[in-house]
Amino acid sequence: MGREGMQGGESGRHRRGIEWPTVALAVLIYGGFALLTFHHAALPAWVFAPACAWLVAWHGSMQHEILHGHPTRSRVINRAIAIVPISLWLPYETYRQSHLRHHDDDRLTDPLDDPESRYLTPADWRALSRPARLLLRLQKTLAGRLVIGPAWAVSHFFADEAVKLWRGDRAAIRAWTEHAVGVAAVSFWLVAVCGIDPAFYALAIVYPAISLLLIRSFAEHKAADGVAERTAIVENAWFLGPLFLFNNLHAAHHERPTMPWYEIPAWYHENRARLLQENGDHVYDGYGEVARRFLFRDHDSVVHPAGVRADLVTSPR
């Protein structure tokens, strides 16, 4: 399978000019966010909260797009577009570095080497308490992922980052210092300028936004012997596909990680037969099928089915 570069970063992308659809998307997201939050008092909460949560989730998808080297040739400009932390919790630089490691496809789903793996090693599983095991098992259902997943993801991310900061990790310190400045600015806008209750913003907007993004990640990868078989495709996602910037066609993204989002659907349809052959027909007919199959049933096991192989134990972190 052809790749544009192991990690799909800016160095591996085809050099092009300004990608105006992505620039327009950024204007839409930030402009919509500013208007919604500034005029929130004129809207009922049941309109404001879902609309703003959608924009925060869309912003997360845009950050994913930008870290792959879009929409300009300038990393400084791209970073300036992506770095505003309207979700509050995730430093952009931390996410960027982690996600690019995820694009080492030979290690996909590996609980030791893939930073986005949802699997545990047998040793890690045995070390967990019974309540923790239950919470992880529940998150193997779509319902559990949506309800429990955001709290689990954020709390464990904070715990891991706190360890890095305590140990004096310079990269983590830089990322969090930069992030703190952005959070202060966004918080000033939300609270001092717009008068939004911080608890309401966190619980009614950020939490559902994370849940929306977890719909995409829920079934996009599964352990398999063949590398290509580890990445799924969700077709006919006419509603959520644009929210995810067509990353629901995930096998296409992993093969061409630097391809701009608006080119993915056409490229996917041109290469559909080959992609399905390579990934073993690991495809879903929309997120409705994902929900019907896995809303209350496990999508996969918590422990990686291969256990711990010698090459996993000795591979570099």
Residue ranges and their predicted role:
Residues 64, 99, 129, 221, ...:
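Divalent metal-coordination and catalytic microenvironments
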Residues 1-55, 85-199, 262-317:
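Non-catalytic, topology-defining segments of multipass membrane proteins
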Residues 67-68, 106, 224, 244, ...:
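Short active-site segment of divalent metal-dependent hydrolases/proteases
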Residues 78-87, 229-244:
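Membrane-cytosol interface motif
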Residues 61-80, 106-116:
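Aspartate-rich (DDxxD/NDxxD/DxxxD) Mg2+/diphosphate-binding motifs
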Residues 74-76, 178-179, 240-241:
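Short helix-capping and inter-helix turn/linker motifs at the boundaries of alpha-helical repeat units
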Residues 40, 70-75, 126, 233-236:
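Helix-boundary and loop/linker segments of multi-pass membrane transporters
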Residues 54-66, 91, 95, 145-157, ...:
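Transmembrane alpha-helical segments that form the membrane-embedded catalytic/substrate-channel core
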